[in-house]
Amino acid sequence: MALLQISEPGLSAAPHQRRLAAGIDLGTTHSLVAVVRSGQTETLADSENRHLLPSVVQYRKEDIQVGWQARQQAASDPVNTVSSVKRMMGRSLADIQKRYPNLPYQFQASENGLPLINTAAGLVDPIQVSSDILKSLAQRAEKTLDGKLDGVVITVPAYFDDAQRQGTKDAARLAGLHVLRLLNEPTAAAIAYGLDSGQEGVIAVYDLGGGTFDVSILRLSRGVFEVLATGGDTALGGDDFDLLLANWIREQAGISDNDHRLQRQLLDIATQTKIVLSEADSAEICFADWQGRITRNEFNELITSLVKRTLLSCRRALKDAGVTADEVLQVVMVGGSTRVPLVRNMVGEFFDREPLTSIDPDRVVAIGAAIQADILVGNKPDSEMLLLDVIPLSLGLETMGGLVEKVIPRNTTIPVARAQEFTTFKDGQSAMSIHVVQGERELVNDCRSLARFTLRGIPPLAAGGAHIRVTFQVDADGLLSVSALEKSTGIESSIQVKPSYGLSDEEIARMLKDSMTNAQEDIQVRKLAEQKVEAARVLESLTGALEKDADLLSQEEQVAIDAAVQALIESVQGTSPDAIESAIKQLDKQTQEFAARRMDTSIRRALAGHSVDEI
């Protein structure tokens, strides 16, 4: 399926004019930029032939340092040197301080509770820090290509939520970059590996970077690239390996001081030791007045529990995809942390096959992003690649009784648009509150609230008379827009969902587990709630009818209806949906004659004063 060559606003669609595009891997620990030149994809190096750019920014009064220079100052100036900023993207200050209590920065909260870091250069937020990293990479690309970039594809973890993705886009715009698309990191890696070889089948992409872990189960078939399921953890990566090793060194050396500068030095030594242990069976450690040695087996014991956590995510993703480990043809290893021998061994044992590591795991994501950028900017209009990503949790609306009506089920491929029609519950209702939720449970209270907005100006008709069409639209970057349209008047209201802080992979996993654990109970709870809503509707409708036409009933009929009403009210107080349903049917039976008389009376009133010819 070929992509249509439609020029972006401001870009020429002239044939033979090659446009400059780049793929950027905006990583937690390191970032890279890659391009396609003369048909070959390559990552770009700096003047000292270093391809990786540390995702570190130092803010000084006189200037800003990005990358290697900033990293060198991290130990001596930790307060003004921001690293692993990706972990802060889209999160509230309270969430960050709870997750990472030992960060050395001087934080203060913005008006909406987001983090601001007080530096020598003033207050900066995660978007500004990310923007400075992107700016540095863009300058490297433009210098190498000798021209201005027409567009970039930036990669993000598969489990980044709307706020985190929007923050990444905002950082790119702040850096003066035109974002062609945000691309999931595992998806980018699969482009670099799977599509080039043309292999069809199921592939697992295991991406363990510095700060995040993602696993994607993909299917490649006849040029169609589909993500079957995703999983992972936005707060687990090689940085955690370093932290465990740094704590081990601290214990062995008998260090009790919690000085931030000392902690940074310990982390630097731990990182270097981890790298040595990827090649050697043991490593010598020198810190202050202490000297020691750690073996690879000792290091493995420290990190085994973390690696097992990643494999649990793999197991869940396989289950979501409806495939077994035996059906996986290849396992793609992504991220610098996959160089750790224990990681490769445990992943190989889990999938029962040797993982693919032929492309540098640090560069493979940037390479895939560059390939995609080259296509999206219009340099490969004949490309047969079709890319489909998925949403991690179902999206829906709250309906009467606190129930959830799912509009887009989880693991639906994106971009996607789905619509459903709803109606009013009460007579004369002129407004409707739209509550957007995310999750797999049947009740709103058990799901995550995303946004609320109100559609006003609905014609005040009888209950059920107005028809409101609610449309959910998720774009290629995973951002959700919800609109509500009253069909008779054309009145519309909409909202773009941008949560103020992120949803961790652990929370997603918990929500999925809870939905499975409580599935039977949820069905019963939903059935009970639905019957209670129906009972309320019936009672409200009957109350209105009696207020207008009670004179149509005999005393005996009134007593019988009152008894049926009381029985229904009592059943609603209970927990049996069947009892409520039975009481509704009994009330309906008692009021059938009343309804027929009301209909006859309405017809007579309508015909009064009119001749047969007029009718």
UniProtKB/Swiss-Prot annotation:
Gene responsible for this protein: hscA
Keywords from the named record: ATP-binding, Chaperone, Nucleotide-binding
Domain of life: Bacteria
PROSITE patterns, sorted: HSP70_1, HSP70_2
Family: Belongs to the heat shock protein 70 family.
The protein's name: Chaperone protein HscA
One Pfam family per UniProt: HSP70
Biological role: Chaperone involved in the maturation of iron-sulfur cluster-containing proteins. Has a low intrinsic ATPase activity which is markedly stimulated by HscB. Involved in the maturation of IscU.
